[in-house]
């Protein structure tokens, strides 16, 4: 059986000493999409932000348990969070391009690493925008502001910005919820293509999206991971009544 690329064990997250994520254990596997579903406030986004230590930015957060990536607990004091976030990139719910050109958005992380060679930057821009399925739409206006793009295009530029740092894992927090159906469909097509080269985890409120995209699904309720397994099996024959009720729209 394929070894997981990342292992979460007994992870708990406290906000102001209130336990909002409760002893969660979950594996992410190479070249798979894992969907995280559940009602609002159930802990999905909290888990996602724990995987690349975005929760560190909130001083009121305390975390226990472990997340093992590359053989090391990412919560070890030795972990360089800047390097970690290059390998485990994140795309947010609202498209958040920087107020600069499309080109500069994509190479932002590379410039932070000190890369100045134009040929390297040019290659990264083209390959990353192609990876995000937007190259043909913007190749003739790379020096236009990314803020002037449509919402769906902005989100794909944000995906390209993540790809440019050569991550192994991409985290997506409801990446299509602010988009129209056509733009959302383009994002979904892009994610399915990216699965060949990356591992993805996506928080989604859409059961249809989870069933279309994901290989595995985890169902969260009030901070607990109640059920996790292959998506087809979970949607066809959930083990927990709470899972069945949520998938069928009876609550949440």
UniProtKB/Swiss-Prot annotation:
ATP binds at residues 38-45. SUPFAM superfamilies: P-loop containing nucleoside triphosphate hydrolases (SSF52540). The lineage of its organism: Bacteria, Bacillati, Bacillota, Bacilli, Lactobacillales. This is Phosphate import ATP-binding protein PstB 1. The keyword Hydrolase does not apply. Coiled coil: none annotated. InterPro entries: AAA+_ATPase, ABC_transporter-like_ATP-bd, ABC_transporter-like_CS, P-loop_NTPase, PstB-like. Keywords: ATP-binding, Cell membrane, Membrane, Nucleotide-binding, Phosphate transport, Translocase, Transport. Part of the ABC transporter complex PstSACB involved in phosphate import. Responsible for energy coupling to the transport system. The complex is composed of two ATP-binding proteins (PstB), two transmembrane proteins (PstC and PstA) and a solute-binding protein (PstS). The keyword Cytoplasm does not apply. The gene is pstB1.
């Amino acid at each position: 059986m394929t070894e997981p690329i990342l292992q979460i064990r007994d992870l708990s997250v406290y906000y102001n000493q209130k336990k909002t994520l409760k002893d969660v254990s979950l594996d992410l596997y190479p070249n798979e999409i894992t969907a995280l579903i559940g009602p609002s406030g159930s802990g999905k986004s909290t888990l996602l932000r724990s995987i690349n230590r975005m929760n560190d930015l909130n001083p009121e957060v305390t975390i226990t348990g472990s997340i093992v990536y590359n053989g090391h607990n990412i919560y070890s004091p030795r972990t360089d969070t800047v390097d970690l976030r290059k390998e485990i990139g994140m795309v947010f719910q609202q498209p958040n391009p920087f107020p600069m050109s499309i080109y500069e958005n994509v190479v932002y992380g590379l410039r932070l690493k000190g890369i100045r060679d134009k040929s390297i930057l040019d290659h990264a821009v083209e390959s990353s925008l192609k990876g995000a399925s937007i190259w043909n739409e913007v190749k003739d206006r790379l020096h236009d502001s990314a803020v002037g793009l449509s919402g769906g295009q902005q989100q794909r530029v944000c995906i390209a910005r993540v790809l440019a740092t050569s991550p192994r894992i991409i985290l997506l927090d409801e990446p299509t919820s602010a988009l129209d159906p056509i733009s959302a469909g383009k994002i979904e097509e892009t994610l399915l293509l990216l699965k060949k080269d990356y591992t993805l985890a996506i928080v989604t409120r859409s059961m249809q999206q989870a069933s279309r995209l994901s290989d595995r699904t985890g169902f969260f309720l009030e901070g607990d991971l109640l059920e996790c397994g292959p998506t087809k099996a979970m949607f066809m024959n959930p083990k927990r009544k709470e899972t069945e009720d949520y998938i069928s729209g009876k609550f949440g």
